[in-house]
Swiss-Prot record:
GO process terms (BP): positive regulation of translation
Localisation: Cell membrane
Membrane topology listed for this record: Peripheral membrane protein
Lineage of origin: Bacteria, Bacillati, Bacillota, Clostridia, Eubacteriales
Protein name: Elongation factor 4
Disulphide bond pairs: none
InterPro entries membership: EF-4, EFG_III/V, EFG_V-like, EFTu-like_2, G_TR_CS, LepA_C_sf, LepA_CTD, LepA_IV
Amino acid sequence: MDKKKYIRNFSIVAHIDHGKSTLADRLLEKTGTLTQREMEQQVLDTMELEKERGITIKSQAARLIYKRENGEEYILNLIDTPGHVDFTYEVSRSLAACEGAILVVDATQGIQAQTLANCYLALDNDLEIVPVINKVDLASARPDEIKQEIEDVIGIEAEDAPLVSAKTGLNIEDVLEEIVEKVPAPEGDENAPLKALIFDSYYDSYKGVVCHIRVKDGKVKPGTKIKLMSTDKVYEVVETGVFTPALMPLKEGLSAGEVGYITASIKNVRDARVGDTVTEAARPTEEALPGYKPAIPMVYSGIYPVDGAKYEELKEALEKLQINDAALSFEPETSVALGFGFRCGFLGLLHMEIIQERVEREFNLDIITTAPSVIYKVTKTNGESFDLTNPTNLPPMTEIAYMEEPVVKASIITPTDYTGAVMELCQDRRGKFIDMQYLEETRVVIHYEIPLNEIVYDFFDTLKSKTRGYASLDYELKGYEQSKLVKLDILLNGDNVDALSMIVPEVKAYQRGRAIAEKLKEIIPRHMFEVPIQAAVGSKIIARETVKAMRKDVLAKCYGGDISRKKKLLEKQKEGKKRMRQLGTVEVPQEAFMSVLKVD
């Protein structure tokens, strides 16, 4: 009997908040994978932060056993994927491990940007797509319209799409039937050399790195010597098994078509990269599975401990997070204003926020983070070129021939009423209009090319507020383009605060400088001497604000009396303030570093 016939590998894709994790919970419950006692909300979102924000950050997997009415038993491997645009690569690898994908669409909201993006990823991997319409128990649900929309926009048959409610558990059985009926059984040859895809990996302090794998060909069991194809390192498999979401060891190993995990005393997640191919050391496969890309950081930011003595602890915290997150990179850097810290690279803004929160939460450290910046390519007049991740390292303008910045292709889905507002926002952010298509009478998808550094700060928040939260955004890196950029420095009391430096387009330097100076004026507390806040490009000051000094009323004790007496006291005070200003240092509160981001 060929057991592959009874295996189905599928994942669930959806836009944020369309009910992906809740549907996964119901499927686990329906197939009796977990007892009622173990059942909690969002079982597959294991991180505290995931539960709190209601988002999936790491991919998870579970093995469900489904008995059909005719007595046949099927093994369904569910691979949960993150829905956020920062983790697109992780999603694409999870999808490559499946043969089918359930496309969850919210019956009240319809198709949104991420739905489309993830759906196209699934189509790129030749997956069978099973549409499921969720939240039909809500009064505002419009299942029939949405079916039509799925057919029109994505072009897949949706007439028989199950109408479910993951919250109440309505029609979940239909989803399981659809998976068995529509998703093809895995193919693969058990006797061929081993070929398996790592679609996720994490570090366990007892077992080393646990690799989630999908075996394409061959088989793997404890004792097999395996080789990872991107690094050519060889390990011996210690344990193989499946997920019930918890790890359950299986002595007999995994064979073609199955999804499970292996451990092989690997010390670092970087050695078992997502997307890599595992093969036998003795009998390697000819070629690796396609699509492997090392994770490339898109956004950089400085992280510093508030208390300089905690530098080593911060280093340890980042190292621990890095063990579990191959996409995080960091290197030590020093700042005149903030002391010793690290320059960290992230996949995107959400990834950055999550790492920062985890450092604060899991390691109880107080940190200061600087404004995020993207990677610029700088070419100097002597022909040398380099990647710039930190604005402070920019050479003087006279030595630069030209600079290039990353540009993304953004697709924004919005109700037609807000088309004008969205286009205005994109134009304002130096966007180049490409095209727009109507999805239906009331919704439109707009494509723009926008420089990444315009998106990094607060594009998403502004987009949401301009469209009352209805618009959704998805973007992918298009490449680098030349543009006129300058470095904006902020001087406090005549000293350059390096942590506030940023790179801005020349045309926006004045308004950005003006806005930052005004913002800092509100945030920096008054000192005993006056503090000038200046924004400068090169040696030219383009904006100035002054935080007035606190002063004692030195004339209070003079009642009447001669004017020269008063003058003498005022002069004396002025002298003192001047001396203070030369010696004094300006305290910059933590909010100042963050407020620079929110300037618009």
